[in-house]
Structures are given as C-alpha cells and as structure tokens.
Amino acid sequence: MSVGSRVPAHELMGVREVAGGLLLVPPGVVGRAADEVRLRLVGRELGRGRWEAVAQGFSDVLVARWRPADGGPPVLVKCPRTGEAVRALVRERDAIAVLASELRPPGLRALLPETVDSRLGARPPVLVQEVLPGVPGDVLLARRPELAGPLAAAAFGVLDELHGTAGGSSRDGRLVDGWLGHRLAVLSDRVRWCRGAEGTAGLLALRSFLRRELTEHPTEVTWTHGDFTPGNLLLRSPGADPPTDNGLPVVTGLVDWADALADGPAVVDRATFALALGWLLDGRTWGEQLVAALRAGVLHRPETGELPLSDALLAWLWHVSGNLEKSRRFARNRGWLREVLVPVLRELAGSAPRSR
C-alpha cells in the first residue's frame, strides 16, 4: 500500500496524534518517501501479507495496519522515525509487559495491547501489537458530545482498577524530586525560551509550588498511564450490542503507554483526562485552561468536578515534557509553544500560586 494513501488515525484503532490541542506538521515529501522505504523493508520481515491502512503522520512514529496472508488477525505496526521515538516505544512495550504481569483483574489485562513482535533494536526498528477493538473516545465525543459525562465515569472506573493494583500514599520528597526533576529538565533542555529569564522564573515557581504541595499533602502513588486522554481510550462502538454497561460506555482498550510509570502520582491521569475534555469539547488549549486554573485556584470541568491546582499543573508538566521528550518537533512548533507551554510559565513567573 502506498504511504500516500492515508486514513484518519482512529481507523487504525486508537492511534492519536494530538498534542495539547494542536496538530503537529506531518512529514513532508522527503519524509513520506522514507516511510515508503520503511514499510517496504518491514513488510519483507513480516512475511506474506498486505498493508491495509497507514495513519496520517503527525508524530515521530509511523503507524500502519498489516493483514497477514494466512488469514490471521490484522496487527498494528509501529515504525519509529527517530531515536526519541524508538526510546518511547521501548518504554511503552516494557511498561505494558510489567503491568500485565502484575494485574490481577483479568478484565483490566484485556484492555492492554499485546506485543506480537518487538524488533526495536533492528534496522528498521519496529513494534508489532495486536489490534484492539473499539472506537477512540475522542472520535466518539466528536459524534456524540452528550456522552462526555458517561464516558468520563467509565474512564474513571478503569482508573480506579488501575490505581488499585498497587501503591499507597506518600509525601516522600525524594520521590517527588524524581517526578519533577527530569521533567523540568526536559523543558529547560529542549525549549530555548525556558532558559531565558521569564522561562526560568516560571520553571522555578512551578517546581517550588508542586514540591510544596506534594510533600505537604499525601499523594497516592501507583501505576499511572501518563497520557490518559479520551483518544487513548477505546470504547465499544455505539452500533454494537450492547454498546453500554449499566448506562456507561464499555471500555475495550487502553493504548499508548509510553509515559506510564509504576510509581507515579495517581492524580496525573484524572487531571489529564479533564484537560483533554476541555480541548475536545470546548476548543480550549491546555495552556488556556491552565492559565484560567492558576487564576481561579482550581481546575473545573462539569464531567469531573473541581480538581486541585496542583493536580492540573502536574498533569500539564507530564504532558508537555512527555511530548518534548518523544519528539523534538514540539520544540520547533511555535504554535504549540505559544498556545500550550509559554502562557503557563509566564503566568507562574508573574504570580506565585497559592497553596491549598
């Protein structure tokens, strides 16, 4: 199949390429030619079969669906375009493997994409996963926004299961420093503006506020997904029978585990979901929502209720640092920086947020 023939990412099963409300620029002509070569080489390794679909590319990972000639089920093939993307897929593969081995509820284990083959150290590197059923939550909301409340309830039910697998509460400063230090360093290293006076002041204010909040108030420590957005949640198609369980959409899969952490702050996932809803339903970027939360002292969504400012800021830090770490293109995307990153640090630099 030609790489030039591309389909919306959701048709490949939950592969989303949205970054805080702004799409990245897809690969140009040269990039598409390289993708053609990648798929040709990977196809030889996979054996007899054909490419069914190739996702529109907005990240550093080329994603395609392969149908084996022997009649077996289709698989999702992920081809990293950069070293950062290779490392992200390694993290995703390893996180899924470890989490699957620790999960006791079999229903939750079934939501994880199984690794069919991993050749991330080969040339070309590739990760092959099973295709999970379902429609991505963001696609479902675009069709039926009135389902936002039930979808959030179903999503948080999955979170309760995930977060209940292990962990406990902590105010350990060393653990908090581990959460914050690396992610703040990513912003400073990747974004030149963050190394200037205003950016540095914003980062220092962010670190001071979050460290104080997370060490003064107990924080649940457990498995965190790290990018828990509606687009990474797969749900039973509305046309399926039955499409709901007790009035809630049925979750059929949870994908994109590159930002997962075995001992992360549980609050990140719920706040990430709330911020993603703000973009999907209201068209408000993460930056706009965080500035409003900084001024109000809380993040409010009708589907999730009020969330502490520290939860929202931690989710924002997880989001922007994760994107910058997975692709250097974010640091060069002026629109993304202007709408998602700079306003938050500028607001932090201008006024220190109040503690709870």
Give, region by region, the residue ranges found by the protein language model.
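ATP-binding glycine-rich phosphate-binding loop
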Residues: 41-69
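A conserved alpha-helical element in kinase catalytic cores
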Residues: 79-124, 143-161
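Active-site activation/catalytic loop segments of kinase-like enzymes and analogous catalytic loops
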Residues: 268-304, 316-331
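Conserved kinase catalytic-core helix
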Residues: 99-106, 133-176, 207, 213-217, ...
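Conserved short submotifs of the Hanks-type protein kinase catalytic core
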Residues: 124-136
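Juxta-kinase regulatory segment immediately upstream of eukaryotic protein kinase catalytic domains
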Residues: 2-52
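An alpha-helical support segment within catalytic cores of ATP-dependent transferases
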Residues: 33-50, 168-225, 236-238, 243-246
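ATP-binding glycine-rich loop module of kinase domains
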Residues: 60-90
